[in-house]
Amino acid sequence: MATARKPRGGAGGAAQPALDFDAPGEIVCGVDEAGRGPLAGPVVAAAVVLDPARPIVGLDDSKALSAKKRERLFDEIVAHALAYCVASASVEEIDTLNILHATMLAMKRAVEGLAVRPTLAKIDGNRCPMLAIRSEAIVGGDALVPSISAASILAKVTRDRMLVELHQQFPMYGFDAHAGYGTPQHLAALREHGPCEHHRRSFAPVREAFDLIR
């Protein structure tokens, strides 16, 4: 899955590059993920190139924001960013590659899906995916770098919406309440019903629940 926004055109339809004021001369994209820890569902990553001419007030780490504020900021980012792309790695890819490599893959897809080619990717965390452009890992970047904050919001809101859709198919697990994380409610449902096709069988609690129903 990848959702990308085309750049807004300037004179003659040429894209207007967004420059990060903290990195003069660079076209910077912020990159973050959502869903490394859950027991179910894909891992989702987003890459965002903000437009300094259209600042977005209130950007922060998505985990520090209420769901209502995340939804509002999601709409603002989609409307005002110069470019964005949301991508994912599937449960099958997570189980095959492991969650770290699947996360790097989702991030790579998000950056490569941007309609504006950045010169620098600022990645939340302590490691970067393999990219064709320069990249910089920033621990806690989702609370420090606006473009990473924006990516964090797009990734989390998108993933939360995906899990709400999964809840419609598998209401017994309560995906709409915990987004696939290993809450007591989710673990109890796993023990009672066993895992579904959207559970990550490479994760120990899911593997244990699968063994119980064999």
From Swiss-Prot:
Q: What is known about what this protein does? A: Endonuclease that specifically degrades the RNA of RNA-DNA hybrids.
InterPro entries on file: RNase_HII, RNase_HII/HIII, RNase_HII/HIII_dom, RNaseH-like_sf, RNaseH_sf
Q: Indicate where this protein is primarily found.
A: cytoplasm
Which key words tag this protein in UniProt?
A: Cytoplasm, Endonuclease, Hydrolase, Manganese, Metal-binding, Nuclease
Q: Using the record's annotation, list all stretches that form the RNase H type-2 domain.
A: 26-214
Signal peptide feature range: none
Name of this chain's protein: Ribonuclease HII
Name the enzyme's class: hydrolase
Q: Where does the UniProt annotation locate this protein?
A: Cytoplasm
What are the record's GO terms for cellular component?
A: cytoplasm; ribonuclease H2 complex
| EC number(s) reported in the record | 3.1.26.4
Needed cofactors? Mn(2+); Mg(2+)
Q: Where does a divalent metal cation bind?
A: D32, E33, D124
State the SUPFAM superfamilies in the record.
Ribonuclease H-like
Pfam family membership, one: RNase_HII
The GO terms this record gives for MF are: manganese ion binding; RNA binding; RNA-DNA hybrid ribonuclease activity
Q: From which source organism is this entry?
A: Burkholderia thailandensis (strain ATCC 700388 / DSM 13276 / CCUG 48851 / CIP 106301 / E264)
What is one process in the GO biological process aspect for this record? mismatch repair
Question: TM segments?
Answer: none
The note describing how and how many cofactors are bound reads: Manganese or magnesium. Binds 1 divalent metal ion per monomer in the absence of substrate. May bind a second metal ion after substrate binding.
- Spell out the reaction equation it catalyses: Endonucleolytic cleavage to 5'-phosphomonoester
- Family the UniProt entry places it in: Belongs to the RNase HII family.
PANTHER family xref list = RIBONUCLEASE H2 SUBUNIT A (PTHR10954), RIBONUCLEASE HII (PTHR10954:SF18)
Q: Which PROSITE patterns match?
A: RNASE_H_2
